[in-house]
Amino acid sequence: MTDIRYITAAEAAASVRSGDRVYIGTSSSFAYEMVDALYDRKDELENVTLLCSMSITPCRMFDTDWPADIPAGRKGNPFIFDTFFLGAGERSAHRKHNMAFEYTSFHLSQIDLWMREIGRPDISFLQVSRPDESGRCSFGSSGICDHKYVVEETKRGVYLESNTGSPYIYGQDNLISLDHEKVAGVLLTDHNAPELMPDKIDDISRKISKIVVAEVPDGATLQLGLGKMSTAIGYDLEQRNDLGIFSELFSQPMMVLMKNGNVTNQCKGFMDGMSVFSFSAGTQEMYDFMDHNPQIYGAPFPFVNDARNIAKNKKMISINSAMAVNLYGEVAADAIGYSQQSAVGGQLDFVKGAQWSEGGKSIIALSSSFMRNGRRRSKISLQFAPGTPVTTPRSEVQYVATEYGCVNLKVLNMSDRVRAIISLAHPDFRDQLTQEAKDAGLIR
């Protein structure tokens, strides 16, 4: 290896100019030492856009109360984040700490296009693993999903935060050499990857899990998301055998299923023998399990979330959550009203791909209601609140599950579909929903 420039975090941050667009990380692959150093320049810079997504890392950038009396982009409040997926870090930065943000609605299968047309980084900070014998670093537990495109589109310089705590993941398009032509500097660090503890499972999630798991056969290939419901479902799948994994997310329950032997990856029919994923968020135990594990295979979003690749897996079971469902069968999973919660993500990619799969199913799971200010409110309604975007259209929705059952909407005409959806609602709301459906002319 030649021409490797080792730097400090401050030297990486010094490369940023006013008006720059700076990529800083995704989920558990987040270059937070460089980001903290960039934060220290808040009184020098203006109009710096931070490109990030699904952040779970505590850092001063996201935990500072940004001044309301200084317009976003000015010195003292220079940073604006631009994202295709709001995680806990981005939500907290905006809602609790007054940080300005921009959001673009994009399917994860199109992240190469997002990076090329919208992201357009001038400078990029990437957390990567320590190098292998040949001097190449892995993009780590989550960087696999998009770092290939980050490097391709970065205009001035890529700075690597080579971390002993970032797992080395096998896969495709997931390595970068320390002497790569775009690498302007390498920072050596030694800390754990950011952890995301499993959600505490409640009774409703347990009920829904048992209903959903009944729809999953032995030999199924799985896609699961984050959250307490997905966690419950993942652990309940210990009842199944010869499972496979082809999922945008690799999660804690998937590790457990692999360790227990429930996941063998021998029945998928596509990329057998490997758990295929794009990003991950979990505990240090999970990252250690993934490190140099030949049964773990990472690939970018445009590959894993390509519905054509998803469909190549036999008995592909896609399980996603939702925030609300209306009586048409439309699904809202990323925003309610004008308040952005997360993102379109890969839900529609997997909803379509799973249904194209031989023996596959798409399942949307949600609790029927929630409590606010001591009052129960329904997640199933005649129509969404004004401003609510549709994540998955009614023409693509197949199974929907709540704690009251699971129905296949795909095979139902409109009036039968409406009645089936009402049967999934909390009993307190069924009469009201039935009357509203009659008044709207949806049922007789």
Show the residue positions of the predicted features.
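Conserved alpha/beta enzyme-core scaffold
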Residues: 1-444
